């Protein structure tokens, strides 16, 4: 499963701040989703951190705060600054520093950006970073991340009323004992139903529609026309 040498044992790094984790996640995400704009300028990085969709929690960080987070990540070698542009641009070095294959990096990135997720949610939300064949393959890489030394993710206790355990990254520190899954928690688990998978997909699509609507309104404002004219006849 592991395609990166010695990834199971890596030097531990200090716990990241919430904003450092967000910055790192944004850099990995944008490398895949907007490769033409990567590495990112400080402005683009700040916009990515403050995105309203695909982020939990939603932030309102300033460029100065983001730059402080970048400096902290640079000291850990997790972020590098390019020297080929007049405008400073930043790129991540997460895979090499943490010894992660691309599959594990994709899962860790979604956890950094969206918070706790089930394996099914991770498969849907990571599709633009890596296409997992099925939920079992997601779980295999999560188990591998949890078995790393130090562990990079942990399985959380199941939320009452939910059928699946969620997972959380550990790059920003340990989670409380009460949140951890206990041995035997999965014994009475019920496989994720098709209905639940559809609900997760509907949420993802709703987020995407919201993003596109915002883009349409912005374009309409720039063109000086009514936003409704852009969708007339649909």
From Swiss-Prot:
Q: List the signal peptide residues.
A: none
The cysteines covalently paired via disulfide bonds are none
Q: Which InterPro entries match?
A: DUF480, WH-like_DNA-bd_sf, WH_DNA-bd_sf
Q: Which family does it belong to?
A: Belongs to the UPF0502 family.
HAMAP family (UniProt xref):
UPF0502
This one is known as UPF0502 protein Bphyt_5265
């Amino acid at each position: 499963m592991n395609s990166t040498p010695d990834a199971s044992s890596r030097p531990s790094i200090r716990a990241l701040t919430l904003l450092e984790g967000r910055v790192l996640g944004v850099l990995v995400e944008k490398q895949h989703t907007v490769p033409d704009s990567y590495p990112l300028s400080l402005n683009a990085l700040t916009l990515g951190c403050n995105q309203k969709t695909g982020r939990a929690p939603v932030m309102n960080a300033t460029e100065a705060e983001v730059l402080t987070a970048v400096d902290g990540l640079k000291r850990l070698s997790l972020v590098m600054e390019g020297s080929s542009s007049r405008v400073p641009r930043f790129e991540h070095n997460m895979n090499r520093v943490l010894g992660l294959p691309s599959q594990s990096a994709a899962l860790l990135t979604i956890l950094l950006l969206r918070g706790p997720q089930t394996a099914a949610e991770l498969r849907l939300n990571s599709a633009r970073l890596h296409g997992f064949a099925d939920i079992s393959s997601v779980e295999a890489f999560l188990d591998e991340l949890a078995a790393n030394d130090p562990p990079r993710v942990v399985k959380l206790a199941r939320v009452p009323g939910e059928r699946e355990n969620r997972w959380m990254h550990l790059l920003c520190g340990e989670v409380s004992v009460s949140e951890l899954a206990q041995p035997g928690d999965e014994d009475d688990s019920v496989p994720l139903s098709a209905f639940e998978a559809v609900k997760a997909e509907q949420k993802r699509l709703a987020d995407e529609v919201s993003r596109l609507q915002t883009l349409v309104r912005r374009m309409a404002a720039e063109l000086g026309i009514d936003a409704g004219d852009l969708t007339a006849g649909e």
